[in-house]
């Protein structure tokens, strides 16, 4: 058996196209142009590339894109002032502060300062709490993308056994809540979990989000399981160069899993696409319009 490859590039492109169609509709019917503001502190090269990608994809979807670049030595007060200004700006419906922030800045205070209605990263305590309570909320983009990828294989997750390996606030915890909302039966595992291979072996759905290269081995998997690899790490190759890998030993898993996301080309493709979804949903909610069809 060779696993089906879940192509994140194709699924993300389809999602972006559907977002663009909905953006055009709300613009035509309601004169509403969703706007996304991204705040970048410092000049980390990887973050700059990511922010540029967000801006390009935002504009390609027909949305307004606003970028605010601040120096690495910006004060906490000045950063919070930028967030407050964006909270008040009626042209901005989504605010994303690129993380991680430089040392000396209080990340929690910055996240808490974002208007929950514009919190398209889904990290504000109001949104995290609503998600945990099973209420409508803006959800973090990577978990949301992971669910969409899973549903490309299993349109209904009801009754399926899922394991989430990793308990971060950004991925693991919100992913558990999204799975519960889909009526899956969820186990959350972490570095202190006993018999992790045994826990994984029972799961129909495996989500690996620990940031440990190729930690999940092929013989851990239940035959036919769907594997969503959320981790990404760069490891050395024999020729002295490096390569990107996920948290799952991909070649081993191919012969056991029923379906699997590659790294790269899987979950990472979905993150920005889901950011566009959240921005569109936020814009419609703020304007008092029905939830868009994405």
From Swiss-Prot:
GO terms classed as biological process: L-histidine biosynthetic process; methionine biosynthetic process; purine nucleotide biosynthetic process; tetrahydrofolate interconversion
Binding site for NADP(+): 166-168, 191, 232
One Pfam family cited in the UniProt record for this chain: THF_DHG_CYH
GO CC, one annotated term: cytosol
UniProt GO molecular function: methenyltetrahydrofolate cyclohydrolase activity; methylenetetrahydrofolate dehydrogenase (NADP+) activity
Keywords assigned by UniProt, alphabetized: Amino-acid biosynthesis, Histidine biosynthesis, Hydrolase, Methionine biosynthesis, Multifunctional enzyme, NADP, One-carbon metabolism, Oxidoreductase, Purine biosynthesis
Chemical reaction(s) catalysed: (6R)-5,10-methylene-5,6,7,8-tetrahydrofolate + NADP(+) = (6R)-5,10-methenyltetrahydrofolate + NADPH; (6R)-5,10-methenyltetrahydrofolate + H2O = (6R)-10-formyltetrahydrofolate + H(+)
UniProt pathway: One-carbon metabolism; tetrahydrofolate interconversion
Enzyme Commission code(s) on record: 1.5.1.5, 3.5.4.9
InterPro entries linked to this entry: Aminoacid_DH-like_N_sf, NAD(P)-bd_dom_sf, THF_DH/CycHdrlase, THF_DH/CycHdrlase_cat_dom, THF_DH/CycHdrlase_CS, THF_DH/CycHdrlase_NAD-bd_dom
Superkingdom, natural source: Bacteria
Record's subunit section: Homodimer.
Family as reported in the entry's similarity comment: Belongs to the tetrahydrofolate dehydrogenase/cyclohydrolase family.
Annotated function: Catalyzes the oxidation of 5,10-methylenetetrahydrofolate to 5,10-methenyltetrahydrofolate and then the hydrolysis of 5,10-methenyltetrahydrofolate to 10-formyltetrahydrofolate.
Name listed for the protein in its UniProt record: Bifunctional protein FolD
Organism: Bradyrhizobium diazoefficiens (strain JCM 10833 / BCRC 13528 / IAM 13628 / NBRC 14792 / USDA 110)
Gene behind the chain: folD
